[in-house]
Amino acid sequence: ELLRTPIRLLAGLLGKVIERQAGAETLQTIEYLRQGFIEERNNPDPERRAALMRTIAALDNDRLKHVIRGFSLYFALANLAEEDLLRQKRADLRARGGELWEGSFRHTLQQCRDNDLSPEQLTELIGQLRFIPVFTAHPTEARRRTTMSVLQEIYRHCATLDHAPENSPAWNHAVAETADLIDLLWSSDEVRSRKTLVYDEINNGLHYFNVSLFQAIPQVYRNLRSALNDIYPELEKMVLPPLLRFGSWIGGDRDGNPFVTHQTTEQAVLVHADNVLRYYSKQLKHLRKRLLHCSSIIAIDPAIDARNEHYARLGVTVFDYNPEDYNNEPYRRLLALMRAKIQHTNRYIQSMGEDQAAAEHAYPNAEAFLDDLILIRNALKQHDPEQARGDIQDLIRLVRSCGFHMASLDIRQESTWHTSVVADLFAHAPNLPDYNALDEASRQQALTQLIAAPGAPLLFEQNLSPETQEQLALMRTIARLRELVGARTFGSYIISMTNRTS
């Protein structure tokens, strides 16, 4: 019943939209089929099933399209209602402070305590934990990002509908907004009208970071920290390792796909970096509005002023409108400088290292950015420990998880491609045998000797096959992006369909 109520509300709003947009007869057809198949599932009847199938077969193309669309939106809204109910149950469980669901941090840590796992053993165990969800481009996910964003808005309104009294101004407003959004869903393309490009797939991955993961990652660490403090208070001072990281195959998984090239891989990494660095910039701006501490009122660690002085050359540009701005608010001054440095970092990365003006003030790596954040957090601990445990700590944990790369890109290509490339390199290099003519043992011996050698034969790349030139370009791109963005920019290099070592 808890699920039927919101589904009934959302379905009612959808029904009004269908009646207005596609006509009462379409709505009646959808309801007839819905009720009929519910009855058929509960009490199978061959005659009823045949009648339902005849109804579907008799629909003209336009009516059939509307019926399919109606069911598609109905199930999308029903899924939202179910997700919202599960969210409510988890929130109620947390609010009561009772036993949480199996697999939660609190439940798992309590099991560790009950089974006499010592704090030292738990520290070692947590230090070994790595949870790395990997995004893949699923060809079955044809929904546009726009559609997913509208569904996300409806989901947010569901929270209001859960808590506001029925027919109250807040409830009525949420109903009206939800009805407008359902109308928008009906009126817009649910799927793309063109073939999905790799760039579309890359941007789809960004959607989940922007609407959910950037906010959820720090909360995961907060939940773990809270559970540890309650169940293992001896570990209150333990620094949580970056156990949560992300991977992606989108833009790296070629596996015989000619549309995924080294340019695609470069684009994927640059888009990832741009997205996460823009988010960091936004968070630094937010922190600048929170850390208003004035040095004329409280004592602030001199290390903050020293860091501001270290960035004085950048400050000439950042504070050109007023060189004295934030002089008595050292945190705000440093955060403004850090935000400028993050923006320079993004420009430098997006230029593939060509923008030397940006390079002067760019962070050399995510660790240098972390160093500034940790400096601020440690200074706050001396006079405002609550702030030190707040948003600044969340950002530190996010940077430890996502770096400047956001998600480590895995590279995948099939073994026959690599065999062809290696054979081509052998064929165009002096003093190397015909790779294709070698047996497995000879191939391994030749490759081992080349890998162990201090250098490689001089190659005339213009004579190489397009596939070999593409592979060399990919390897150079990987090396350059690792240098620019960070060592964790790429994850695994996967050679698929292998059947021998060479």
Language model segments and positions:
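Often metal-dependent polyanion-binding catalytic scaffolds in large enzymes
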Residues: 1-452, 465-470, 489-492
